[in-house]
Amino acid sequence: MVRISGVDLPRNKRIQIGLTSIFGIGNTSADKILTTANLSPDIRCSDLTDEQVSSLRTIIDESYQTEGDLRRVYSLNIKRLTEIGSAAGRRHRVNLPVRGQRTRTNARTRKGKVKTAVAKKKGR
C-alpha cells in the first residue's frame, strides 16, 4: 500500500490517477510530478518501488500544498471574507451561492432541503 501525504493510494489504479486522490493534486499536477520524478504515468500504484515512492513524497512535500494544510488555507480564506463583511463573505454566512448564481429556482445543494411554509388556520 502506497501512502503519500497521509492518503493511501488505490493499488490497482495507474499512478497518474492515484495521485489525484490526494486533495490538492489534479491531473495537471500529477503529470508534472511524474515528469519531475521520471516515471511513466502508466505504472500501477502497486508496482512502485520504495525508491520511486520516496522520490514522489519528496517532490510533493517540497512543491505542493496538500490535504490538511490546503483545507486550512481554504477555511481561513472563507473566515477572512466573512469577518471583513465582503459580499462573498455575507453569502457564505447565510449558505447561499457565492459566485452570482441564480437562487429563485435551483441552488438546492447550497440552500439545503426545501422548507415548506405552514398555512394559517382560518376562523380563529
Swiss-Prot record:
GO terms for cellular component: chloroplast; mitochondrion; small ribosomal subunit. InterPro entries: Rbsml_uS13_C, Ribosomal_uS13, Ribosomal_uS13-like_H2TH, Ribosomal_uS13_bac-type, Ribosomal_uS13_CS. Residues 100-124 are annotated as: Disordered. It is found in: Plastid, Chloroplast. GO terms for molecular function: rRNA binding; structural constituent of ribosome. Its main location: plastid. Keywords: Chloroplast, Plastid, Ribonucleoprotein, Ribosomal protein, RNA-binding, rRNA-binding. Residues 101-124 have a biased composition (Basic residues). Part of the 30S ribosomal subunit. This is Small ribosomal subunit protein uS13c. It comes from Emiliania huxleyi (Coccolithophore). The lineage of its organism: Eukaryota, Haptista, Haptophyta, Prymnesiophyceae, Isochrysidales.
